[in-house]
Amino acid sequence: MTAQTEFDEATVQDVVRLAGGHDSELRELTQKYDPAMISRLLVAEILSRCPPPSNDTPVLVELAIVHGSERFRHFLRVVRDSPIRPVGADEGFVGMLVEYELTELLRELFGVTHERPAGVRGTKLFPYLTDDEEAVEQIGTYLLAAQQGTEAVLAGCGSRKPDLSELSSRYFTPKFGFLHWFTPHYDRHFRDYRNQQVRVLEIGVGGYKHPEWGGGSLRMWKSFFPRGQIYGLDIMDKSHVDELRIRTIQGDQNDAEFLDRIARRYGPFDIVIDDGSHINAHVRTSFAALFPHVRPGGLYVIEDMWTAYWPGFGGQADPQECSGTSLGLLKSLIDAIQHQELPSDPNRSPGYVDRNIVGLHVYHNVAFVEKGRNDEGGIPTWIPRDFESLVQASSGGAT
């Protein structure tokens, strides 16, 4: 049974919400749900966060999660070039015991991030060796492996802010390092959302038609947003990517009615990222359908505007003929932000985007659209509209 099938989405979101609250809410959580189930959920989350191990010698790290008189023991096999995975207690040498109180581990994983360098957990090296001579004999074989293996497991037991560029490389996404250099921009614009219980929708799961590829970007966002729920939309079936806090949806980003339906079901979203087909008409359809489902204060991101110049993607080689492209959309958003400054026209009324866009940040091949109430008021009509009259009015009549 996978984490995705054992833990339904509503339960996971409820656990995350309560874990970020007051101690009374943590108590409510452990009364509302079976502690054994919570323990399994936490281990599934930890395994998804652990970096690649560096130890050459296989070793087991025992993760013990304690709640009152109950003790839930999980043995994790750690070795280089393999994912960390649960095994039986007799399937290797236990190099380290790591013990957490259930509520402490809930806070470490799903609470609002806080630095607690000490006093969070208990540890014991070579916990099941009772003979000192035997322990000395094992030092040469397992000491380094226990250290490196424990480091990898503990890295998955917290919510310290990761480096997005490193995550992009770990999960093999094109957002940094060879085709693009987006991660510094993402870090700048996403950092304030990191500790929130965000809902992120990314269009384009990756891997194209390959039945086993894709999902790297979704895993990157899952790691970056430790309390977030990540959705991925793709024209192909990418359900093999589904796991705890990641859900994929199959569908066409150029189908406005479909986009509206999924947004009503899974939104509103804090962040939408369009890294889909990059066909210009698709980009514009998706924005029109999904921007209304971004919450106030949220972001809509468009990647890969280079296709605006490529006719094979519905683009225009001449920048002056860009009205139907992704860049044409972005250029129109500047007027939308400034709509209250446009000359009065009885035949024109502000649209939804005009009233709900407050910022636009455009970089090489990636743009961030800020949503909010765009109603600060234009310059009053009694302010002169020509320079000389403005100077005279502002000079108190002085000449």
From Swiss-Prot:
Superkingdom of the source species: Bacteria
Catalytic residue list: 278 (proton acceptor)
Keywords attached to this entry: Antibiotic biosynthesis, Magnesium, Metal-binding, Methyltransferase, S-adenosyl-L-methionine, Transferase
Pathway it works in: Antibiotic biosynthesis; mycinamicin biosynthesis
SUPFAM superfamilies reported in the protein's UniProt record: S-adenosyl-L-methionine-dependent methyltransferases
EC number: 2.1.1.238
A molecular function GO annotation: mycinamicin VI 2''-O-methyltransferase activity
Necessary cofactors: Mg(2+)
GO biological process per UniProt: antibiotic biosynthetic process; methylation; protein homotetramerization
Disruption outcome: No production of mycinamicin II and accumulation of mycinamicin VI.
Binding, Mg(2+): 275, 303-304
Annotated positions binding S-adenosyl-L-methionine: 173, 202-208, 217, 234, 252-253, 275
Catalytic activity: mycinamicin VI + S-adenosyl-L-methionine = mycinamicin III + S-adenosyl-L-homocysteine + H(+)
Family named by the database record: Belongs to the methyltransferase OleY/MycE family.
Function: O-methyltransferase that catalyzes the conversion of mycinamicin VI to mycinamicin III in the biosynthesis of mycinamicin, a 16-membered macrolide antibiotic.
Known partners and oligomeric status: Homotetramer.
Protein name: Mycinamicin VI 2''-O-methyltransferase
Organism (species): Micromonospora griseorubida
Gene designation per UniProt: mycE
